[in-house]
Amino acid sequence: MAENTVNAINVDPSEVEKFNKLAGEWWNKTGAFATLHEINPLRLNWIEENVKCGYVSADHQKTAEMGLAGKKVLDVGCGGGILSEAMARRGADVTGIDLGTENLKAASLHAEQSNLQDTLRYQHIPVEALAATHAGQFDVVTCMEMLEHVPDPAAIVDACFKLLAPGGVCVLSTINRNPKSYLFAIVGAEYVLRLLDRGTHDYAKFITPAELDKMAIDAGFTRQDIIGLHYNPLTKRYWLAQNVDVNYMMAVQKPRA
């Protein structure tokens, strides 16, 4: 398993500052995070489908019909809470964690305005630190669009494994590393189409599916599914497909002993 040291926080301060400066934009659906709002229904449905297919409860019964409803969910790197809120609305009991204090203020305020305080809460804590005190406490863990922003993504994946109860499902998303992903995710998204602010991504931190698969296996997970997320700039339409050349999501499961 990846070595995990809680004292050495696995974070790039410049990345935290970058997103803190944009904290006021999280719930502006036409602002800096418009792309996240647009893809949120796709990723939410894919997460729920994988929970239905993979989650196994303590009594070894697959609760396929329930999906996210009734599950304890941890959203790692929750930002302003776009995905966290959506999962809470599906009936999950959600905890979102992030290291950006301004992000969490925006997330908490919006949750209060949306009357979701009973099923949604936020904490300012590294995932490794939470794993040291809350191992095995969650049915589902999500870590979306975060791994390519940290120094040691393997440690994040390892912490996600520790936090899951046996039989739980973890969904990860990141960006593949190849010439096509550089062209689409950086040149296209940041400079040509301006879907994202310039400097949002660092190509060297992109992660291939093989690398993420190895991180997951080393942590103890078994692979469940993988899917690519695609965008047509002419029609402004997003969809899921098997091609994982650029953005992709991976669902993995913690085996039940």
Curated annotation (Swiss-Prot):
S-adenosyl-L-methionine binds at residues 43, 77, 98, 144. GO terms for biological process: methylation. It holds the Pfam family Methyltransf_23. It is an enzyme of class 2 (transferase). InterPro entries: SAM-dependent_MTases_sf, UbiG_MeTrfase. It comes from the Bacteria. Its EC number is 2.1.1.222, 2.1.1.64. It catalyses: a 3-demethylubiquinol + S-adenosyl-L-methionine = a ubiquinol + S-adenosyl-L-homocysteine + H(+); a 3-(all-trans-polyprenyl)benzene-1,2-diol + S-adenosyl-L-methionine = a 2-methoxy-6-(all-trans-polyprenyl)phenol + S-adenosyl-L-homocysteine + H(+). Pathway: Cofactor biosynthesis; ubiquinone biosynthesis. Keywords: Methyltransferase, S-adenosyl-L-methionine, Transferase, Ubiquinone biosynthesis. GO terms for molecular function: 2-polyprenyl-6-hydroxyphenol methylase activity; 3-demethylubiquinol 3-O-methyltransferase activity; polyprenyldihydroxybenzoate methyltransferase activity. Belongs to the methyltransferase superfamily. UbiG/COQ3 family. HAMAP family: UbiG (MF_00472). O-methyltransferase that catalyzes the 2 O-methylation steps in the ubiquinone biosynthetic pathway. This is Ubiquinone biosynthesis O-methyltransferase. It comes from Psychrobacter arcticus (strain DSM 17307 / VKM B-2377 / 273-4). The gene is ubiG.
